[in-house]
């Protein structure tokens, strides 16, 4: 199906992780599903700028306390029919960055029912379309080992 005349939809987010044995990561509770803190880019934003803005808006966690892994960037591509675009089929690209916190931060969920910290379990299944793929990409990024921030922790 052609996407002629319709620019792709771009969104970005951050997989927030905390070192430990095992490390843990944050997911947001939408009431009916879990997801990463992410959202659509605003005009003129880079993927990273949008990811950090969405992370701050959805979690209340300041970008100042997050260390972004410069070697990890994962893109997910799929087709959507979003209401905001009149349900016309569009290509959507979601870019996910990996961010590390020194410790679990207080989360202020302003746009969601809540949040949950998950302990890292290799190849766990949470949500096939986005989360599982990102977690597998992170594990592959670390050579199949338990993720750890650069320089150890």
Which residue stretches match the model-derived regions?
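Glycine-rich, flexible loop segments associated with nucleotide phosphate handling
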Residues: 8, 24-26, 84-94, 139
């Amino acid at each position: 199906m052609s996407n002629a005349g319709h620019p792709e939809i771009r969104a970005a987010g951050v997989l927030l992780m905390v070192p430990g044995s095992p490390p843990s990561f944050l997911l947001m509770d939408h009431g009916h599903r879990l997801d990463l803190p992410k959202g659509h880019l605003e005009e003129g934003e880079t993927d990273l700028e949008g990811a950090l803005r969405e992370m701050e808006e959805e979690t209340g966690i300041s970008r100042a306390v997050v260390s972004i892994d410069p070697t990890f960037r994962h893109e997910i591509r799929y087709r959507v029919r979003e209401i905001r675009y009149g349900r016309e089929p569009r290509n959507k690209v979601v870019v996910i960055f990996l961010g590390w916190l020194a410790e679990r931060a207080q989360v202020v969920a302003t746009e969601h029912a809540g949040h949950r910290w998950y302990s890292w379990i290799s190849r766990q299944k949470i949500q096939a379309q986005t989360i599982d793929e990102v977690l597998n990409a992170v594990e592959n990024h670390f050579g199949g080992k338990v993720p750890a921030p650069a320089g150890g922790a």
